[in-house]
Regions:
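N-terminal secretory signal peptides that target proteins for export/translocation
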Residues: 1-15
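Bacterial N-terminal signal peptides
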Residues: 18-29
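Sec/Tat signal peptide C-region and signal peptidase I cleavage site
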Residues: 30-34
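A cross-taxonomic marker for long C-terminal extensions/tails that follow the last structured domain
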Residues: 36-46, 122-123, 128-191
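Acidic/histidine-rich, surface-exposed loop or edge segments in extracytoplasmic proteins
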Residues: 57-75, 116-120
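Solvent-exposed, acidic/flexible segments
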Residues: 71-81, 99, 129, 170
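Histidine-anchored nucleotide/phosphate-binding helix
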Residues: 78-97
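Acidic helix-start/capping segments at beta-turn-to-alpha-helix junctions
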Residues: 98-116
Length: 191
């Protein structure tokens, strides 16, 4: 009887130690994870997902138009649409497709429009620096064409001279979108 009790006790201890070891391994593996930013540093975090069965096709010339209409949750945050454009570039880069090998454009309108303001104007209106300044600069340096809807500027009471010089003013987002689609760009709405 004593031998049977000792055997059960040993099995319980082994089971407990196995559980503790498994929990420790899970914690260690989660601590070692780090997002990557191969092209747009600090924005558009990606994981390479080496086991992914579906990856970008290197034989395709990717031409994508992002339609950015959603504003950030708060004015001190980077616009999620701009971050998605950065993520697209970073995902392509971890798949060995560099910015020079893709053609990207983004049109900004609706609630997202304040991101286009020059820092001084943004600061005057919202009492903080424009958190989108750096990502706009990085996207332009990576070759992304950025547009803002002129109709939205007028509706929001924003003057053309208030727009960041890296962002072109379009007569309307409703002209940018079909023009790029007719030029063969894939349309990717960001709501």
């Amino acid at each position: 009887m004593d031998a049977l009790l000792r055997e059960k006790s040993v099995k319980r201890q082994i089971l407990k130690r196995s559980f503790v070891l498994a929990a420790a391994l899970v914690c260690i593996s989660s601590w070692s994870f780090a997002w990557e930013y191969p092209v747009i540093k600090g924005y558009g975090a990606v994981d390479p997902v080496p086991s992914a069965a579906f990856r970008p096709d290197k034989s395709i010339k990717y031409r994508v138009l992002f339609d950015i209409t959603k504003g950030a949750e708060t004015v001190d945050k980077v616009n999620p649409g701009l971050d998605r454009v950065a993520r697209f570039l970073n995902v392509m880069a971890v798949s060995n497709i560099m910015p020079k090998d893709v053609e990207l454009a983004a049109v900004i309108h609706g609630p997202a429009t304040p991101v286009v303001l020059k820092n001084a104007i943004f600061k005057d209106k919202f009492k903080i620096d424009n958190p989108n300044e750096k990502i706009v600069k990085a996207l332009k340096e990576a070759g992304v064409s950025l547009y803002v809807c002129g109709q939205t500027l007028v509706e929001d009471g924003f003057k053309n001279k208030w727009v960041n010089e890296r962002i072109a003013i379009a007569v309307s987002a409703s002209i940018v979108i079909p023009t790029y689609q007719l030029r063969g760009y894939a349309y990717l709405p960001i709501f």
